[in-house]
Amino acid sequence: MISDIPKVGQKLSDILSEKFTYEDLRARDKISKEKRSLRNLIKEMEDEVLASAGVDSFEEIFKLIFTKLYDELICANDKTAYLKFRNSGDTDFELKEKIQGLFDDAKKKWEGVFSDESKILLSPSHLAVCVSTLQDIKLFNNNLDVVDDAFEYLMSKAQKGEKGQYFTPRYVIDMCVKMMNPTVNDKIIDTACGSSGFTVHSIFKVWKEIRLSKGLEPGEDFTASERTADERDFVRDNVFAIDFDEKTVRVARTLNLIAGDGQTNVLHLNTLDYSRWNEVTKQEDWNDTYNEGFKKLKKLQPKGSSDFSKFHFDLVMANPPFAGDIKEQTILSHYELAKNDKGKWQKKVGRDILFIERNLNFLKPGGRMAVVLPQGRFNNSSDKYIRDFIAERCRILAVVGLHGNVFKPHTGTKTSVLFVQKWDDKLCPQKEDYPIFFATMQKPSKDNSGEKIYVKDGNGEILLDHHNHFIVEHDLYNHDGMTQDGIAEAFVEFAKKEGLSFFQ
C-alpha cells in the first residue's frame, strides 16, 4: 500500500514492525499453547547461542527476563501500548539499541538489581536469536512458576549446587503457606530465601484476603496490574527475606519488587554470621541498595536487644542449605546447638542445625515456623539433643515427609518439613502432652530424573487450571478445586480441632 511507504525519519522496521499488544501475547503464549517450558527454551538458547557467545549465561538471560518483565508490565497497564521486546523488522543493531533502552528503563523502575552502568553484553546477532526465542512467552503468570523454573535452572548451573542450596518447589511452598496461614498483621521472614518463594506466596495469600475484605475480585497473583495501598503497605512493612548469595538475592529482589509493586525488604546478609552485620552494613555499596529494608528489620528487634541475635517475627518459613558444616568458631560461639549433648563445643556443626536455632531466635513468643530439614534430623539418635532443644522451646505442630524426588535433579536427599509454634502463655500455653500431626507425601510430583509429573485428563492430555497453567501431580493440597484435598487441608482440620491460635 502507498500509505506504507516510510515517511521522512522512519526506518523500514517502523513499517514492518508488528504491532503486538499484551492481549496478543496472552493469545499466543507458547507455554500454554505449545506446552513449552521456559527452562527448556533457555536450554536450547544455551546450546545454540550462548555456548559460543563468550558471556555469563546467568547474567545475560537474567537481563533479558528482567527487561521482558518490564515490557509486559508497561503494556499490561496500558492497553494501547505495544510490546517492544520483539524481533520484527529491526536490523540486529537496531534491535540491540531498542532492547538496551528497555533494559535501562527497567533498571530505573526496579532499582538495586543491576548497576546503573550495566549493559547487555550479547552481540547483536546473538541477542536477536535470544529475543526471538523469548518474545512469545508470557512471563507474568499467576504463580511465578514460569520465571522461577527458569531461574532455578540458571542458578543451579551457576552454583553447581554448592552449599546444598536448592529452590523449594512452589507446591511445597504453597502447602506451608496454607498450613501456617499468614495474615495481614503478621511480620514474616525467610532467613534463607533463595528466589523468595515463601515470602512471595505469603504475599499472594494475604493480598487475596485484603481484596476480599474490601469486596474486590481476588485477581491474579503474580500480575502486572497495580496494587491497592493496603497491599503495598503489607509488603513494605511486614515482609522480609535474607540470603548470603548475591546472585540469589538479586533474583529474589526482582520477584519481590515486581510482586510487591516496587516494595522489597530482601537483604544480602549471612543469616548465621550476625555478629558481622554491623561491619557489612556500613559498606557504601551495600547501604545504597539495602539500607531502607535493613532500617525496618532493626526495628523488629525486641526491647533492649541491638546485636541482631533476636527478633520479633510472627512467622519464619525457610529451606536452609543442608550441605556443608560451619567450622568458624566466631560463628559457632553464638549457638547453643554448637555444643554436643554433653555440653562441649563442637569443631564443626551442620549448617541446617544452626539455622534451627537462628530461626527460633527470629520468632517472638507464640510465633510459628515452617522449616525444611534433612530427614535424618528427625530419626538419628545422635540428633536427639536437637529435637530436645526444639521441644523445650516450642510446640511441635506437624512433621510432613516429602517424597525423595521433590528436590531432584539437584539432590535425592530425603527431607521433611517441621512446623512449630513457640511457647507463649496466651497464644501457645506450654503443655507436656499434646497430639502432633504427621503425614507423608505419597505422590512423587517428579519422576526419577527430576521432571515434573502433571495431572492429566481422561484422554491422557495434560490438564490446565483456569489460569492456563499445568497442575503438578501431588497430594499436598487441593489445587483450586481441581484435585483432591491433601495434607494441608487435613492439617487445617487438625489445627481447628486443636484450637491453634492461628486458625481461630
Feature locations, PLM:
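A conserved structural/catalytic subdomain of Rossmann-like adenosyl-cofactor enzymes
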Residues: 5-24, 274, 280-504
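Generic recognition of flexible, low-complexity loop/linker segments
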Residues: 52-53, 177-178, 227-229, 238, ...
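Charged, often flexible domain-edge or linker segments that flank or initiate folded functional domains
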Residues: 1-106, 199
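Class I SAM-dependent transferase core
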Residues: 45, 146-171, 177-180
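Conserved S-adenosyl-L-methionine
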Residues: 165-296, 311, 315, 323, ...
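Short acidic-aromatic active-site loops that bind/stabilize oxyanions
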Residues: 140, 162-166, 344-349
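Active-site-adjacent bridging/hinge elements
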Residues: 32-43, 147-152, 225-227
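Long recognition/docking surfaces used for binding and targeting
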Residues: 61-62, 66-157
